[in-house]
Amino acid sequence: MKPENKIPVLTRLSDEMTAVVNFQQPGLPPWPADGDIETQRQYYLLERRFWNADAPSMTTRTCAVSTPYGDVTTRLYSPQPTSQATLYYLHGGGFILGNLDTHDRIMRLLARYTGCTVIGIDYSLSPQARYPQAIEETVAVCSYFSQHADEYSLNVEEIGFAGDSAGAMLALASALWLRDKHIRCGNVIAILLWYGLYGLQDSVSRRLFGGAWDGLTREDLDMYEKAYLRNDEDRESPWYCLFNNDLTRDVPPCFIASAEFDPLIDDSRLLHQTLQAHQQPCEYKMYPGTLHAFLHYSRMMTIADDALQDGARFFMARMKTPR
């Protein structure tokens, strides 16, 4: 797609989204476009500090979980002494960026709104770790906590997965992995998915949207994919291209959220339409005027907070004893 033919999304954003795009953090240097991956990771962490400030206070605990690939750090957010369910969170960042600190506010808000313990999983990043390592680490973490629930005051009879962007793919892929490999870590009552990618290689939205403002040009998306996958054959794997998995049966209820001007929105639309066509429980919600990654900006965007609360309500409604 010739760049001039793309939709000029910056002229169509909501006032809140425009304010975020135009916001300049004092003293923040420009994005190190030519820097190595570690430099970009450090910049991402620095840039996210502002957006993670003023988050709800609650009890947190860090735990290193042994996996076949080594220890994986997890962080438990406990808004109250006992929890009716456990929600595992996978952060976004194109498989190559992000950690528990870059998504701290999101997880704290989810814990507050659900009243449940949220466990953030600091899975290994690409390209140092490649598919399916992050999924297998997630499964190992779930297995660990299902076996040690009493030590952490967890209720793992009912669990859920949640994630944004690449983390949304990992959340759904991990739930399908548990189903397909017959691994039981608890009853998966819901999966909360914010603007994920689920396996499309091309789409109308990928042609019309994406630019320097969101880091999701076609070249960017290709780079993330090449960093994550081991080889070209992995593109068709049913835990990467999730549309190659069986979505006609036993898919946990999915809350599918999208951003209006996201090049990945067609992934969410197709996922919703596929699940709906096969009577799999799901709910789709598009948030108007937003760009990819808007969930981070709840300090300035009420719609970001709305999106978190919508996901929390979806999760709570599927508990045996809703709050």
Swiss-Prot record:
Keyword annotations of the record: Cytoplasm, Hydrolase, Serine esterase
Pfam family, one: Abhydrolase_3
Record keyword Disulfide bond present: no
InterPro entries attached to this UniProt entry: AB_hydrolase_3, AB_hydrolase_fold, Acetyl_esterase, GDXG_lipolytic_enzyme, Lipase_GDXG_put_SER_AS
Active site (catalytic residues): 165, 262, 292
Subcellular location field: Cytoplasm
Disulfide bonds: none
Gene3D superfamilies linked: alpha/beta hydrolase
An example Gene Ontology CC term for this record: cytoplasm
GO molecular function: carboxylic ester hydrolase activity
Subunit structure: Homodimer. Interacts with MalT and MelA.
NCBIfam families: PRK10162.1 (NF007547)
Role played: Displays esterase activity towards short chain fatty esters (acyl chain length of up to 8 carbons). Able to hydrolyze triacetylglycerol (triacetin) and tributyrylglycerol (tributyrin), but not trioleylglycerol (triolein) or cholesterol oleate. Negatively regulates MalT activity by antagonizing maltotriose binding. Inhibits MelA galactosidase activity.
Name of the featured protein: Acetyl esterase
Species this chain originates from: Salmonella typhi
